[in-house]
Design a protein with these regions (language model features):
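Conserved blade-register residue in beta-propeller folds
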Residues: 11-12, 71, 146, 191
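Loop/turn-rich, solvent-exposed surfaces of beta-rich toroidal or solenoidal domains
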Residues: 90, 94-153
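Single conserved hydrophobic/aromatic residue that forms the stacking wall/gate
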Residues: 1-13
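Beta-rich, blade/repeat-based domains predominating
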Residues: 36-55, 111-132, 164-178
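Blade-level signature of beta-propeller repeat domains, shared across WD40, Kelch, NHL, RCC1
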Residues: 174-191
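Residue position within the beta-strands of beta-propeller blades
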Residues: 58-59, 136, 182
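Blade-edge beta-strand/turn elements of extracellular beta-propeller
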Residues: 11-43, 94-111, 149-164
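Short loop/turn segments immediately following the C-termini of beta-strands
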Residues: 61-63, 139, 185
């Protein structure tokens, strides 16, 4: 999977550049590129394929607020530039409603913005009780958050820690042990 933030879309193609035959067709958009998988995403940051249900999940930066975590949905539209997900433009003007029918709905929204960055769906031995939960890093409030969810239903959010190591840019899980590694903007790696 490849994403293209500049054009507010997610693109899906094979590593060799070929387009999957089952990519969606958007109604009334016959001239759109065949690799487009989903539209209406403002500023995608993190993406992971769940080892539990094989669905793709992502984090997105809103403008001033309106960050979200949700599922990348085949052929659907998250509504960017029509919807503001609760955020406002940097000038303070309203972007649009948080959500409305006809658009994909995120699992979790953040207003004010946390500047959601990377994310993973946790699978490991180190924190077995977290298996299947989303671990989401943030830049603005420098936090690691755990989101418990079931399909598209938000259950709970826990801030594991905040304001301790700086702006967290990336998260990786050691496959064999489930240990968590965090990478900050300063280039530090934390375990």
């Amino acid at each position: 999977y490849r994403s293209s933030a500049a054009s507010d879309v997610y693109k899906r193609q094979h590593l060799d550049g070929k387009i999957p035959k089952d990519n969606p067709k958007f109604k009334g958009k016959d001239n759109w590129l065949p690799e487009i998988y989903q539209i209406g995403v403002r500023n995608p940051q993190g993406m992971d394929v769940s080892p539990y249900n094989n669905k793709i999940y992502l984090t997105n930066h809103g403008a001033r607020g309106g960050d979200w975590f949700g599922e990348a949905k085949y052929g659907e539209n998250y509504g960017w530039k029509i919807l503001g997900w609760g955020g406002t433009n940097y000038t303070g003007t309203k972007i649009g409603p948080k959500w409305k029918p006809g658009f994909s709905k995120a699992i979790k929204y953040w207003v004010p913005s946390i500047a959601a960055s990377s994310m993973v769906i946790y699978k490991g031995e180190e924190f077995k009780e977290w298996n299947g939960d989303a671990l989401i890093t943030s830049l603005r409030d420098q936090s690691l958050r755990k989101i418990k969810f079931n399909d598209d239903k938000f259950i709970s959010e826990e801030i594991i820690f905040k304001d301790k190591i700086g702006r967290i840019r990336d998260i990786e899980i050691q496959e064999k042990t489930g240990e968590i590694f965090l990478i900050t903007d300063q280039g530090s790696v934390w375990k």
